[in-house]
Curated annotation (Swiss-Prot):
Disulfide bridge map: 29-56, 36-50, 40-57
InterPro entries (UniProt xref): Beta_defensin_dom
Protein name as it appears in the record: Defensin-B1
Provenance organism: Ornithorhynchus anatinus (Duckbill platypus)
Residues cleaved off as propeptide: 61-66
Length: 66
């Protein structure tokens, strides 16, 4: 794998998984045991988790029915 691609993926991963308090994405879901806390509306394209304005979702997008 190209080093630049690997670096970019690492940066994106850290951005998505860093809590908002530490400068991560503001809309990142807070998960408990891999599941988000509240029903979601919009899928986070980077992490695969769904997100909502406040607070976040209840389960992964892949587990959504329809």
């Amino acid at each position: 794998m190209n080093a630049h691609v690997l670096l970019l993926c690492t940066i994106l991963f850290l951005l998505v998984h860093t809590p908002p308090v530490l400068g991560g994405m503001k809309e990142k879901c807070v998960t408990m045991g891999g599941y988000c806390r509240k029903q979601c509306r919009v899928q986070d394209a980077l992490s695969g988790y769904c997100r909502n304005e406040n607070p976040c979702c209840v389960r992964r997008v892949l587990m959504e029915d329809g």
